[in-house]
Regions:
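Short beta-strand to alpha-helix junction loop
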Residues: 60-71, 95-105, 140-160, 169, ...
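Glycine-rich FAD pyrophosphate-binding loop
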Residues: 24-47
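Helical element adjacent to the flavin cofactor pocket in flavoenzyme catalytic cores
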Residues: 140-198, 202, 206-209, 384-395
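C-terminal catalytic lobe of FAD-dependent flavoproteins
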Residues: 299, 304-396
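Flavin-dependent oxidoreductases
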Residues: 18, 177-288
Length: 396
């Protein structure tokens, strides 16, 4: 086949489908297609996250993360209300367990205020009123944080996109992107081809690979970090009422293991952050030699490893030692034991790394000629999806 379209979106996660939905609204007469390599939507990052509606408290004021999270959160909540998608604004606590963490907590609170987040510093006694089993000498109560199932949101984007005459091709693994005559672009898979005017790369874990097919930036690499979870057994779900987070380490872009209640009442514990041996290597024994070799031979990888080797070893130890994982959870909820938790499916986060070994701590979206590349869209991309989609469309 060789069908022709105005716009081609690569990637069937929440960023890809929110973009497809808004693009089809803005250009109702245009032919738009979304290509997904899997047989269904949300098989990877969107379908494997903890389902939190983030407030924007963590991000540097004025950054793309801060701006898109704040505006995207409002848009997401309105979209859910308009389309009868279940979500809950339940609030969360970020706890400090010692004096050093209280200093970081104060700085985080001030950042939240700068970003316009509804939050307050609370005492230990107030913390225990909100989360009776939490441990902390002080905490931030983030009232506007919430929970949601992002697969439900993405499915609605997909349904509305189809209703607006959008096309979706599943099982289409993009292997070639080439500019051809008349300023058209040929996008190819095995035996299948489509022609379009513009390409939008929302490929998540594979965004760097798609970018390189079109001659995009080579000064960064998507490094896959696996986040492993446990789940509280039903008899232990009372240990967490809503969301309990640690005070984050500002030197690392991940938030640390935490407790997250789902809409169904279940409670996830995690994730950690360990190097994944492949972009879809979810199991402990999964290993993709080519992808792992590509990661560790990237010039910035060893520089990153030298900066964060101690934390990397700690995370790896927790990955293979349940007692160590439980020890991290006990810092937040001392009553928890290994008997309270059961394994839960892991996820893999796409995190861009630059040549200097820096983990890029902001959204990066760029355009050139015939393609818009979403180079880096880690958390809070799901919360921010509609705002990110507007940014993408503005660059077409």
């Amino acid at each position: 086949m060789k069908d022709e379209f105005d716009y081609c979106i690569i990637g069937g996660g929440i960023v890809g489908f929110s973009t497809a939905y808004l693009l089809s609204q803005k250009f109702p007469k245009s032919k738009i297609i979304l290509l997904e390599k899997e047989s269904n939507i949300c098989k990877h990052q969107t379908g494997r996250n903890s389902g939190v509606i983030h407030s924007g408290i963590y991000y540097k004021p004025g950054s793309q993360k801060a701006l898109n999270c704040r505006s995207g959160k409002k848009s997401l909540e309105k979209f859910c209300l308009d389309n009868d998608i279940n979500f809950e604004i339940c609030g969360k606590v970020i706890v400090a367990t010692n004096h050093q963490e209280t200093l970081r907590l104060q700085a985080l609170y001030e950042r939240g205020v700068s970003n316009g987040v509804e939050c307050e510093l609370i005492s230990k006694s107030r913390l225990l009123e909100i989360e009776p089993h939490a441990n902390g000498v002080e905490a931030i109560h983030v009232k506007e944080c919430g929970i949601i199932n992002y697969t439900d949101v993405c499915q609605k984007f997909s349904d509305l996109f189809r209703q607006l005459n959008g096309s979706i091709y599943f099982n289409f693994l993009v292997k070639k992107i080439k500019k051809i005559k008349n300023n058209k672009v040929l996008v190819s898979s095995d035996g299948n081809h489509i022609i379009c005017n513009k390409v939008i790369n929302c490929a998540g874990l594979y965004s760097d690979d798609i970018a390189r097919l079109s001659g995009g930036k080579k000064n960064f690499k998507i490094i896959p970090f696996k986040g492993e979870y446990f789940k509280l057994k039903k008899t232990s779900q009372h240990l967490c009422k809503n969301l309990i987070y640690p005070t984050p380490n500002p030197q690392f872009p991940f938030l640390g293991v935490h407790f997250t209640r789902g809409l169904d009442g279940s409670v996830e514990c995690g994730p950690n952050a360990v190097l994944a041996f492949g972009k879809e290597a979810y199991g402990k024994l999964d290993f993709n030699l080519a992808e792992t070799f590509s990661s560790i031979t990237f010039p910035g990888f060893l520089k990153m490893a030298s900066k964060h080797w101690r934390m990397g070893l700690e995370e790896m130890y927790r990955s293979y030692n349940k007692k160590a994982f439980v020890k991290a959870l006990k810092r937040l909820v001392p009553e928890i034991s290994s008997r309270d938790i059961t394994p839960f499916p892991s996820g893999i986060r796409a995190q861009a790394l630059d040549l200097s070994g820096n983990l890029i701590d902001d959204f990066v979206i760029d355009s050139s000629d015939y393609i818009v590349n979403v180079y880096n869209a880690p958390s809070p991309a799901a919360t921010s999806c509609l705002s990110i989609a507007k940014t993408i469309i503005s660059k077409i």
